[in-house]
């Protein structure tokens, strides 16, 4: 049987909370014969922030990708750096998350340049919330020696 553990955005919005859920997952994995499947949401506020910036683009307002990324980039990287203790694992996690953040910045800059938000581009932008939180949790689990999750 499979056990699905779902964690919302509030559960992953700080390093301490990420460590708490990683320990819950580790305990469940250790104490259960079930396969554990973990689902994490975007960090609290990320989806709203993406909707906000795309709404501004749709309304023809001048949008600063740089200001958006000044908020998003350090927030995600700070959580990661404070949740993971193993330097090697942290460096791998930083690489993955930084690449995603760079991609987010580039996609957003392109949308601003075109001054057009299509349903497809909005969906793609919104996917970054989960795509950023997932490796943070995954590498935190690796930090706890759960490398196959």
Language-model segments: what does each one mean?
Residues 1-147:
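Nucleotide/pyrophosphate-binding catalytic subdomain
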